[in-house]
């Protein structure tokens, strides 16, 4: 169940920081989405 993590700037679920390799999902500066830090 250990899937590949999302790289920087990939879209991520706001409530799932561990979805990202960095463990950080942040709001995109311009778009109304969340991306991995």
Swiss-Prot record:
Site feature Reactive bond for trypsin, where: 32-33
Disulphide bridges, residue numbers: 5-21, 12-25, 20-36
Keywords, A to Z, come to:
Disulfide bond, Knottin, Protease inhibitor, Serine protease inhibitor
Pfam families in the record:
Tryp_inh (PF17983)
> Does the record's keyword annotation contain Disulfide bond?
yes
Q: Does the keyword Transferase apply?
A: no
GO-annotated molecular function:
serine-type endopeptidase inhibitor activity
Q: Which residues form a coiled coil?
A: none
Superkingdom of source: Eukaryota
Record family assignment? Belongs to the Mirabilis serine proteinase inhibitor family.
Q: What is known of its domains?
A: The presence of a 'disulfide through disulfide knot' structurally defines this protein as a knottin.
Function comment:
Trypsin inhibitor.
Recorded protein name is Trypsin inhibitor 1
* Organism (species): Mirabilis jalapa (Garden four-o'clock)
């Amino acid at each position: 169940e250990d899937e590949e993590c999302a790289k920087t700037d990939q879209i991520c679920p706001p409530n799932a920081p561990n979805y990202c390799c960095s463990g950080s999902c942040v709001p995109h500066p311009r778009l109304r989405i969340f991306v991995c830090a």
